[in-house]
């Protein structure tokens, strides 16, 4: 009987921007026959989606430190010490051959534990500006990867290989043909993030109303509002819901949504930028102005610099500015085709494979 393949532990937590790329790497490793377990928390998205993927989740007692009161920081430091002890015991007990960190504060104590116990440590930074945890772990890691150039300081040796994405998106990308040329209604996908984005929800329905009332009915909208915001947005669209407008709190199948869309209006999370490139979709990007280290603006530059998107600052976003952009695109469909091609040219589709290859090289070196 063939020997059981080694165990690899994933570390990622908090938001989908960390968890979903880690799931993509985990899926690749599982497809190669490796055992995969996960270090996370009971508070983040991983607590729901990791067990649903059939992967064992080990939870640490750790909390974020940044942006809190002094008392919260003291508590977080105590939790950090406890989490480090938990991580040391977990890594000793489970004995992984390699540990992969994909961001989120849970990666901190688990990554330090892996380093202390001389386990190969691989880290991947999704954003164009590295987060605190990955900046601290980078000098300890055996391999450092980034989704975009410029994520780390020049004194850190790292490789840019894109962000891992779910397999269904890669499969949809093979059929990503961009066919909008103005002969049918423009399909606008509005995505404010999994938790929604109130400024986007407040502005878009009014802009669409003004567009249609001005005589331009050649548009369809699929609007993700975020949980708990869909009723208000439906009321804002009103009678337009019978004229090609769809509203949903959350879109489960983003591959279908991107395939449907001719233009996407969205925030600038690292995973969103990567998915736009993989699917070759032009975008209006609205960076979250208060994101830590302003990383969403840096993420947006990846697409705006190559011509795959246009950026709209939140402070400048109102019904008039959105209406003006939509009118420009409707009047110049060739511009959208050019942007779509530029976005797709920036795609790096095989990041999960590269991270998995690195794990294998470290384990069998």
Question: In which residue ranges do the predicted regions lie?
Answer:
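Active-site-proximal region of nucleotide-activated glycan assembly enzymes
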Residues: 35, 45, 56, 115-175
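Conserved nucleotide-sugar phosphate-binding/catalytic loop shared by glycosyltransferases and other
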Residues: 5-13, 30-82, 227-229, 313-315
């Amino acid at each position: 009987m063939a020997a059981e393949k080694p165990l690899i532990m994933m570390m990622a937590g908090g938001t989908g921007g960390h968890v979903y790329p880690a799931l993509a790497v985990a899926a690749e490793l599982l497809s190669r026959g490796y055992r995969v377990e996960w270090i996370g928390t009971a508070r983040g998205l991983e607590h729901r989606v990791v067990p649903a993927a059939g992967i064992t989740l080990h939870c640490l007692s750790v909390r974020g430190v940044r942006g809190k009161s002094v008392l919260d920081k003291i508590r977080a430091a105590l939790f950090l010490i406890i989490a480090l002890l938990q991580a040391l015991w977990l890594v000793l007990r489970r004995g992984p051959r390699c540990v992969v960190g994909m961001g989120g504060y849970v990666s901190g104590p688990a990554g330090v534990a892996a380093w202390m116990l001389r386990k190969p440590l691989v880290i991947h930074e999704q954003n164009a500006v590295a987060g605190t945890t990955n900046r601290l772990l980078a000098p300890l890691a055996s391999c450092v990867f980034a989704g975009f150039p410029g994520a780390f300081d020049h004194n850190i040796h790292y490789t840019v290989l894109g962000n891992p994405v779910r397999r269904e998106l890669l499969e949809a990308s093979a059929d990503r043909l961009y066919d909008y040329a103005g002969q049918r209604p423009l399909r606008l996908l509005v995505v404010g993030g999994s938790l929604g984005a109130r400024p986007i929800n407040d502005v878009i329905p009014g802009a669409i109303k003004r567009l249609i009332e001005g005589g331009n009915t050649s548009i369809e909208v699929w609007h993700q509002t975020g949980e708990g915001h869909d009723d208000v947005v439906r009321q804002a669209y009103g009678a337009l819901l019978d004229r090609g407008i769809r509203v949903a709190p959350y879109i489960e199948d983003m591959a279908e949504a991107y395939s449907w869309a001719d233009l996407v209006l969205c925030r600038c999370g690292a995973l969103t930028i990567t998915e736009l490139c993989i699917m070759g979709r032009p975008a209006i990007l609205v960076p979250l102005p208060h994101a830590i280290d302003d990383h969403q603006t840096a993420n947006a530059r990846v697409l705006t610099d190559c011509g795959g998107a246009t950026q709209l600052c939140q402070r400048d976003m109102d019904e008039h500015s959105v209406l003006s952009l939509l009118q420009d695109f409707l009047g110049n469909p060739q511009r959208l085709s050019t942007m779509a091609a530029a976005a797709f040219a920036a795609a790096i589709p095989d990041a999960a494979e590269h991270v998995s290859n690195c794990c294998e090289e470290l384990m069998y070196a």
